[in-house]
Amino acid sequence: MGKTVKIRKDDMVLVIAGKDRGKRGAVLRVLRDVDRVLVQGLNMRKKTIRRKSAQDEGGIMEVEAPIHISNVMIMGKKGPTRVGYRMENGKKVRVCRKTGEVL
């Protein structure tokens, strides 16, 4: 904790470790305090939902569970890459370490 999190919401990422290794998805949410991300459709867990009223149905839902940021890599145009920063027109922008393109 305390490091800069280089992954942002809506980034395409590749899972590099764990049961979903090799799969890709978009980041739904970044949990900075615990260094984890929620990736759409990956690391699914079953969650029990209580019935709240007579019409409302309870049951078992599948929801995304957080993945540690060390287990994902941002996808550039040519594949997974590390992220660097560069100043362009007085603004700090994220760049692909492999190709130098702006992310």
Swiss-Prot record:
<dbReference type="GO" id="GO:0019843">
    <property type="term" value="F:rRNA binding"/>
</dbReference>
<dbReference type="GO" id="GO:0005840">
    <property type="term" value="C:ribosome"/>
</dbReference>
<dbReference type="GO" id="GO:1990904">
    <property type="term" value="C:ribonucleoprotein complex"/>
</dbReference>
<protein>
    <recommendedName>
        <fullName>Large ribosomal subunit protein uL24</fullName>
    </recommendedName>
</protein>
<dbReference type="InterPro" id="IPR041988">
    <property type="entry name" value="Ribosomal_uL24_KOW"/>
</dbReference>
<dbReference type="Pfam" id="PF17136">
    <property type="entry name" value="ribosomal_L24"/>
</dbReference>
<comment type="subunit">
    <text>Part of the 50S ribosomal subunit.</text>
</comment>
<dbReference type="InterPro" id="IPR014722">
    <property type="entry name" value="Rib_uL2_dom2"/>
</dbReference>
<keyword id="KW-0689">Ribosomal protein</keyword>
<comment type="similarity">
    <text>Belongs to the universal ribosomal protein uL24 family.</text>
</comment>
<dbReference type="Pfam" id="PF00467">
    <property type="entry name" value="KOW"/>
</dbReference>
<dbReference type="InterPro" id="IPR008991">
    <property type="entry name" value="Translation_prot_SH3-like_sf"/>
</dbReference>
<keyword id="KW-0694">RNA-binding</keyword>
<dbReference type="InterPro" id="IPR003256">
    <property type="entry name" value="Ribosomal_uL24"/>
</dbReference>
<keyword id="KW-0699">rRNA-binding</keyword>
<comment type="function">
    <text>One of two assembly initiator proteins, it binds directly to the 5'-end of the 23S rRNA, where it nucleates assembly of the 50S subunit.</text>
</comment>
<keyword id="KW-0687">Ribonucleoprotein</keyword>
<dbReference type="GO" id="GO:0006412">
    <property type="term" value="P:translation"/>
</dbReference>
<dbReference type="GO" id="GO:0003735">
    <property type="term" value="F:structural constituent of ribosome"/>
</dbReference>
<comment type="function">
    <text>One of the proteins that surrounds the polypeptide exit tunnel on the outside of the subunit.</text>
</comment>
<dbReference type="InterPro" id="IPR005825">
    <property type="entry name" value="Ribosomal_uL24_CS"/>
</dbReference>
<dbReference type="InterPro" id="IPR005824">
    <property type="entry name" value="KOW"/>
</dbReference>
